[in-house]
Structure formats: C-alpha cells, structure tokens
C-alpha cells in the first residue's frame, strides 16, 4: 500500500485487505494476527473490524477469533446472480455426468484466479469440495492456466518461467490445461478457457482425485458446457 494514499482510500484499502486475509486464513484469525498481517497497530485493526462488523461483513466468535459475515454472501449473490443462473445448470450437468467437481473461475487480478461457482456430483465415491471464493496463483492449477491460455504473453505474471511457457504453449495447441498436485495435494484438474461478455478472463474446470475419463473427452465436455454458458449469459 502506498503511503501517498489519502486517509479515506487507505482505510478502505485496509478494510478490503482485512477481508482478504480472513478469507485466506486456514482458521479464523485473532485481532492480533490480523494486525500483524496488515502491519498496523492492534487498535487500527480493531477499528477496521468494528466497521466490518457493523455491516455484517465479519464477526467474532466467543473465543474472539474473526470470521467472514453473512453480509458478504448477500453482496456476492448480487454480483454473480446472472452468471449463477447461466452457469450453475451446466456445472451441475457436467459434475453429475463425469462424477467430478465442476467449477467456474475468473481472473481476480494480475496474479490470482478465484472460483466463483462450483458444483459437486450427486453420486460418487469421493466428493471433492471446492468452495466459491477459493483463490490461488493464476500460474498454478488447471483453472488458472486455462485463463492464461486466453491471454497474450505480455499480460501474464512476471514469474512465468520458460518451463511454464512451454506448458502453456502445449496446452494452447491441444485446447485445454491439465494439472496434478498443484493447488490442492493429489488432485487432478482439466480446464478450458471461457469467454463471458463483460467479465474478466475465465475458465471452466473439473477437479477430482483421479481422471475417471480420458482427458480429451473431459475437455470436449467442458468446451460444450462453456459454449452454452457463454450463450446463456450473453442472451
């Protein structure tokens, strides 16, 4: 964060960053841990938290640890309602047909991708839970790499090395991205780019502990679903 920020914009930036830290934490953090992550005094973190609590965006449990509030769900529903209506039926269909968790991810910023919508199969031996809001580097995992396929090289993050460039070139030629053991240990992912009118670069992907079908046939199923989502969303 720049020291030249105006007080109002700096406070807003810190509040947003606080929400991001809470969302990325493996367990609800304490106020002291939030202050440390923000590199601010505990009193500053406390005031930010009070504001978030007043809007239902965060809350403290009986032990004093901080979690995200239900108000965020209401905000998210408003942002993605049209996309939910267009994508969820297709994600459910793919998940149930292939027996794999299906998700839609978008580019969050220059460095990260975030899952917006996910669907789990109704009947399968092993169900992989992958919640909306899950963030990971755009250079790791099938969903992020599929997004890179749709971007020119100059729009890639600076840490894309020659090995990853070669992998992306291969993925672009075959039309899909493949990953194993990159974002979540032991999980496989197949993903394809997805174009959504008026939205950031996106991808549609499946994840599972194995590949129960040929990766090429999985990719073709994802492409068909992606085309229907794009048409429904742009209608």
Where do the model's predicted regions map?
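Extended hydrophobic
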Residues: 160-232
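Short amphipathic alpha-helical signal-transduction/dimerization elements
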Residues: 23, 148-152, 223-234
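Short, structured helix-loop boundary elements
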Residues: 9-12, 69, 84, 88, ...
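A structural signal for short hydrophobic beta-strand segments in well-ordered beta-sheet cores
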Residues: 58-59, 104-105, 194
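Short strand-connecting beta-turns/loops that link adjacent beta-strands
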Residues: 63, 109-110, 197-199
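N-terminal helix-turn-helix
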Residues: 1-81, 231
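Amphipathic alpha-helical effector-binding/dimerization core
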Residues: 67-68, 73-156
């Amino acid at each position: 964060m720049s020291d030249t920020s105006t007080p109002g914009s700096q406070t807003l930036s810190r509040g947003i960053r606080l929400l991001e830290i809470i969302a990325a934490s493996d367990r609800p953090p304490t106020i002291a841990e939030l202050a440390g992550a923000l590199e601010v005094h505990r009193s500053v973190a406390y005031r930010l938290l009070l504001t978030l609590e007043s809007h239902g965006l965060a809350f403290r449990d009986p032990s004093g640890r901080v979690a995200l509030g239900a108000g965020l769900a209401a905000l998210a529903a408003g942002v993605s309602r049209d996309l939910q209506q267009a994508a969820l039926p297709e994600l459910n269909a793919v998940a149930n047909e292939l027996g794999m968790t299906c998700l839609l991810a978008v580019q969050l910023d220059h460095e990260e991708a975030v899952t917006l919508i996910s669907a789990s199969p109704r009947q399968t031996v092993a169900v992989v839970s992958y919640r909306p809001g899950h963030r990971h580097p755009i250079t790791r995992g099938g969903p992020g790499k599929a997004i890179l396929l749709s971007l020119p090289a100059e729009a890639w993050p600076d840490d894309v090395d020659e090995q990853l460039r070669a992998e992306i070139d291969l993925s672009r030629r075959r039309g899909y991205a493949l990953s194993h053991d990159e974002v979540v240990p032991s999980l496989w992912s197949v993903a394809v780019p997805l174009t959504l009118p008026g939205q950031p670069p996106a991808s549609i992907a499946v994840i599972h502990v194995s590949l129960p079908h040929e990766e090429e046939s999985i990719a073709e199923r994802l492409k068909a679903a992606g085309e229907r989502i794009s048409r429904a969303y742009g209608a």
